[in-house]
UniProtKB/Swiss-Prot annotation:
Enzyme class, UniProt record, top EC level: hydrolase
Names of required cofactors: a divalent metal cation
GO MF assignments: 5'-nucleotidase activity; metal ion binding; nucleotide binding
Transmembrane segments: none
GO CC terms, sorted: cytoplasm
Protein name (database record): 5'-nucleotidase SurE
Keyword flag Kinase: no
The entry's keywords: Cytoplasm, Hydrolase, Metal-binding, Nucleotide-binding
Entry binding sites for a divalent metal cation: D14, D15, S45, N100
Record localization: Cytoplasm
One protein family per Pfam: SurE
Amino acid sequence: MGKLMAPKILVTNDDGVYSTGLKAAFDSVSDLGEVTISAPAVQQSGVGRSISIFEPLRITKTDVGGIPAYAVGGTPTDSVILGIFTILKQMPDLVLSGFNIGENISTDTITTSGTIGGALEAASYGIPAIAASMQVLDEGQKFDDPRDYHRERFEAGIKIVNKIARNVLRHGMPENVDLLNINIPYHAEEDTPIEITRLARKVFKTDVEERRDPRGRSYYWIAGDLIREEEEGTDVHAVMQKGYVSITPISLDSTARIEFSEIEKYL
């Protein structure tokens, strides 16, 4: 009888290849199979599922805490595409995107998060995908150097993601689920309760700050405060109010669940 092949796992992120969160993601699945890292060379937060089609991409071999890795001069989606079609040259059994430094909750982040964007790209090929994010208490930490973020903050998340990834590899995804979006609260322990949630509508109260440069010309920062109170059963409520781990099953199919006759009225 032939020897069973170890599962192939691709790891990516949006904070850049040298983020401590990426090393934590590697550690969370390192005992589950043959792990390859393909991640953006630099910070790519907020790029969503964007893809580079007007410029060439380069891949640089590097290492993450002594682990061989590939740094891609592009987005998380680029990193997944090159990881699959150029580096691995085959479909992996699982793609893990994370750990993001900062929570990715609500519909706000599904279309803007590079962490989730990379996972969605993998899911579009039928690959089981997990996006994992770690809550920060100080929103300013999202803009600090991700190489300096405290390694110990990921310990509980590593164990939680390991268990979930192990079961995804063993059983596959449930029907109509393409991606599991996991958010770990800042003070999580291994026994922190886990809640299966739906997406909240919003997590940001969007604002725009106008400032003036030395020549008196206006420039702008997109900003806003976090929404911490949302309906029971949402990811925002679970993470922000209860301090629970949130797991939200996501489908690529964004078609509204309505009778099409409702739209025909507009024709």
